[in-house]
């Protein structure tokens, strides 16, 4: 199993810079075509082309593996591995000329949907993060770990908002206000994979968000876990890429955050 994971990881760590270069070049062009999947959910021709590049590479080199991707959906495979792909996380940032976007490619065990490989590239930040289950987390070649901050007042948090802003917005604002008043602050980057990778290397102490999809957390979630972080749902259930809410932390402030959401999360519609 380990050699199979190394093979897949090594191959894509060498391939994904090609996709990153494409996105950077496309980002410099004017007249980027944008379609709306929803009021706040955008898709560009760059998303679709980047996804095709990644999926073609998977099917050419690992034809028995399954695929789950944001734009194309599910493609069943015959092996024990399924690739989980978000070709452009942070599309709204991308369309507005901001550099905070990434390419997320994870591999999960097909039956359990447990992440075993995570790779996230940030083309215009000129860096990438990666992990193999049981082997630690890395920013490029440097090992990374979550922060050791244990108090809320010294902690910096990050969050995101679901695409449907009308769903339980009042409750979400209550979370935001309560945590903001007890901590050093809350940030929002607009890219879940960036939030998780920055948490993994100690920039943030905690992250929470509702309405995430498997491709938002398969790769970056593993990177957090391998950086000795902790992940559950916002109501404390075990981590799965299929859960509809996510709470990630350095582990030391996790129970404090769970207490903020206690008795409230089941009131949120998503």
Predicted segment positions?
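N-terminal subdomain of lithium-sensitive/metallo-dependent phosphomonoesterases centered on the IMPase/IPPase/PAP
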Residues: 1-88, 252, 268-270
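Solvent-exposed alpha-helices and their adjacent loops that cap or buttress functional pockets
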Residues: 35, 75-77, 110-112, 130, ...
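Residue-level signal for inorganic ion chemistry
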Residues: 23-24, 47, 58, 91, ...
């Amino acid at each position: 199993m380990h050699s199979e994971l190394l093979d897949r990881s090594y191959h894509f760590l060498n391939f994904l810079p090609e996709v990153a270069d494409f996105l950077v070049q496309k980002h410099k062009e004017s007249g980027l075509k944008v379609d709306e999947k929803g009021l706040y959910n955008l898709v560009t021709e760059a998303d679709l082309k980047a996804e095709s590049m990644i999926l073609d590479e998977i099917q050419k080199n690992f034809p028995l593996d399954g695929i789950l991707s944001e734009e194309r959906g599910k493609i069943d495979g015959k092996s024990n591995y399924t690739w989980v792909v978000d070709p452009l996380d942070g599309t709204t940032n991308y369309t507005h000329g901001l550099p905070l976007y990434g390419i997320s490619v994870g591999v999960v065990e097909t039956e359990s949907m447990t992440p075993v490989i995570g790779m996230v590239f940030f083309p215009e930040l000129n860096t990438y993060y990666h992990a193999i289950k049981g082997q630690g987390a890395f920013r490029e070649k440097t090992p990374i770990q979550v922060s050791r901050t244990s108090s809320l007042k010294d902690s910096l948090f990050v969050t995101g908002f679901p695409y449907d802003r009308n769903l339980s917005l009042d409750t979400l604002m209550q979370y935001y206000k309560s945590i903001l008043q007890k901590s050093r602050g809350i940030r929002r980057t607009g890219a879940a994979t960036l939030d998780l990778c920055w948490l993994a290397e100690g920039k943030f102490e905690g992250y929470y968000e509702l309405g995430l999809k498997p491709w938002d957390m398969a790769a970056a979630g593993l990177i957090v876990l391998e950086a000795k972080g902790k992940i559950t749902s916002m109501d404390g259930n075990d981590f799965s890429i299929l859960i509809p809410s996510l709470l990630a932390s350095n582990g030391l402030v996790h129970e404090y955050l769970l207490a903020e959401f206690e008795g409230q999360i089941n009131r949120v519609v998503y």
